[in-house]
From Swiss-Prot:
It holds the Pfam family RuBisCO_large_N. Its EC number is 4.1.1.39. One of its GO terms (biological process) is photorespiration. It catalyses: 2 (2R)-3-phosphoglycerate + 2 H(+) = D-ribulose 1,5-bisphosphate + CO2 + H2O; D-ribulose 1,5-bisphosphate + O2 = 2-phosphoglycolate + (2R)-3-phosphoglycerate + 2 H(+). GO terms for cellular component: chloroplast. Belongs to the RuBisCO large chain family. Type I subfamily. This is Ribulose bisphosphate carboxylase large chain.
Length: 440
């Protein structure tokens, strides 16, 4: 008595257009393409149900809880202009559905199951609104932009980096030599590539030792603080932390993690260690395009960027707009603001579906990396501004005179662009002239 078994439409329970969202709700914007014959309201309700309390049939144990309190709600659906049978579904989730301080649990709940749902031809998570009531349960970046500048004693310009190439095959000693030449030439950072971990040709401990020697030698000769992103990513969390501990014992200022392949749990653990022990944390987004490149299915990078800010990282790769990797200018600047700023207004032209208030969570420096070189410097300086890292791999090591002259060229070009900008010159129009004048 009182329990009516059977399958019923999701929209009868989970489509609630009259719902007024709460300040504590986590809000999601999904781009959904229903299968032919599936109404948009049913598809949106299915997304809300399968990413919260629902299953395919009514169950007796529904009567032992309060679905009204815990269910996700599809509260709005809008058609996508210019697309046939495609919609943005807005879903509100009560805060109690999620474990505090766990990006892992957040993603397991919202995107863990629903993407294989057969009522949908395709589904993409476009944006999340993280309320302060939830974001305050995370430590966020280990240090943040201002603390990093204070640690490095570098202000008023973007920071310069370089990924050591070839990414695989160098011995530890030759790797250290390349690091020294780049840092001595004027770069602030050099970087392990994302797949440099601990391979037979270069074990991690040997690399760390030779890189530390290069760091201290270049610091002594230039009088500047230098860093190398020592990749601590490993097969286990225990091994990852062991490598981070060794980096700290050597006196290195920064370590690195591949946060998508390494996982959010490992990343958050490493971020806690870095905060407690004064290490900066550089984040590489290896594997992101598997998740974010398709327009209609997957997760947009702005969501992965928000997740990283909560999980913890001081730098993250964010595309270039001008280099070899894909990225639209306005959309890229949208998630760059989501990484750096405290308060970001809703702006659909930049792909920002919700106003995001990070309250006091530190910001993350966006890293522009991938196919960029010295002639891109004016555009990069204008697009990314001072709070960024501009990273030239082939654009440094590919210089015809060698690594150190490549580093010098990048540093001279950057300082010329910053000075020209500060003097009020138009970098977009005069960029090439500024670079040529600086090279004389």
């Amino acid at each position: 008595v009182g329990f009516k078994a059977g399958v019923k439409d999701y929209r009868l329970t989970y489509y609630t257009p009259e719902y007024k969202t709460k300040d504590t709700d986590i809000l999601a914007a999904f781009r959904m393409t229903p299968q032919p014959g599936v109404p948009a309201e049913e598809a949106g309700a299915a997304v809300a149900a399968e990413s919260s309390t629902g299953t395919w049939t009514t169950v007796w144990t529904d009567g032992l809880t309060s679905l009204d309190r815990y269910k996700g709600r599809c509260y709005d659906i809008e058609p996508v202009a210019g697309e046939e049978n495609q919609y943005i579904a807005y879903v509100a989730y009560p805060l109690d559905l999620f474990e505090e301080g766990s990006v892992t649990n957040l993603f397991t709940s919202i995107v863990g199951n629903v993407f294989g749902f057969k009522a949908l031809r395709a589904l993409r998570l476009e944006d999340l609104r993280i309320p302060p009531a939830y974001s305050k349960t995370f430590i966020g970046p280990p240090h943040g932009i201002q603390v990093e500048r204070d640690k490095l004693n570098k202000y008023g310009r973007p920071l310069l980096g370089c990924t050591i190439k070839p990414k695989l095959g160098l011995s530890a000693k030759n790797y250290g030599r390349a690091v020294y030449e780049c840092l001595r030439g004027g770069l602030d950072f050099t970087k392990d590539d994302e797949n440099v971990n601990s391979q037979p040709f270069m074990r991690w401990r040997d690399r760390f030792l030779f890189v530390a020697e290069a760091l201290f030698k270049s610091q002594a000769e230039t009088g500047e603080i230098k860093g190398h992103y020592l990749n601590a990513t490993a097969g286990t969390c225990e091994e990852m932390l062991k490598r981070a501990v060794f980096a700290r014992e050597l006196g290195a200022p920064i370590v690195m993690h591949d946060y998508l392949t390494g996982g959010f749990t490992a990343n958050t653990s490493l971020a806690f260690y870095c905060r407690d022990n004064g290490l900066l944390l550089h984040i590489h987004r290896a594997m992101h395009a598997v998740i974010d490149r398709q327009r209609n299915h997957g997760i947009h990078f702005r969501v992965l960027a928000k997740a990283l800010r909560m999980s913890g990282g001081d730098h993250i790769h964010a595309g270039t707009v001008v280099g070899k990797l894909e990225g639209e200018r306005e959309v890229t600047l949208g998630f760059v603001d989501l990484l750096r700023d405290d308060y970001i207004e809703k702006d659909r032209s930049r792909g920002i579906y919700f106003t995001q208030d990070w309250v006091s969570m530190p910001g993350v420096l966006p890293v522009a990396s991938g196919g960029i070189h010295v002639w891109h410097m004016p555009a990069l300086t204008e697009i990314f501004g001072d709070d960024s890292v501009l990273q030239f791999g082939g654009g440094t090591l590919g210089h015809p005179w060698g690594n150190a002259p490549g580093a010098v060229a990048n540093r001279v070009a950057l300082e010329a662009c910053v000075q020209a900008r500060n003097e009020g010159r138009d970098l977009a129009r005069e960029g090439n002239t500024i670079i040529r004048e600086a090279s004389k």
